[in-house]
Amino acid sequence: MVTLEAEPSPFVFDVGRTVLLVIDMQNDFAAKGGMFDRLGIDVSMIQAAIAPTARVLESAREQGIKVVYLKMGFRPDLSDAGLPDSPNWRVHSPAHAGEPVRAPDGTES
């Protein structure tokens, strides 16, 4: 059992029965040239979450907590994004969803 001091009360959990979910921490949302950037959304607040998230991941791994990553994605042709008049198409088509994005290290993701 691990106890984290927190407000309004300490949080106690069993690391053997706990996973850390990391949701949507992906280059397409946070990187320059990614989907949000192409939509004109300021990604600086998303980028500001990267370092704290990395610290949480490091701490979780040190405690033996399993990490599960969930990410949003579509096929390049958006065939799995719903019907052409669906919200996914209206939002993701102008954002060029499905196009490759360069990660900060230069790799394509």
What kind of region is each of these model predictions?
Residues 26-31:
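Short acidic, Gly/Ser-rich segments with clustered Asp/Glu that frequently serve as metal-coordination loops
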Residues 33-35, 81-82:
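Short amphipathic alpha-helical segments
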Residues 15-17:
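A short, charged/proline- and glycine-enriched loop
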Residues 35-45:
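Short glycine-enriched, charge-decorated loop/helix-capping segments at active-site entrances
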Residues 1, 45-46, 104-105:
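Short, flexible loop segments at the rims of nucleotide/cofactor-binding pockets, characterized by
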Residues 23:
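Active-site flanking residues adjacent to catalytic metal/cofactor-binding acidic residues
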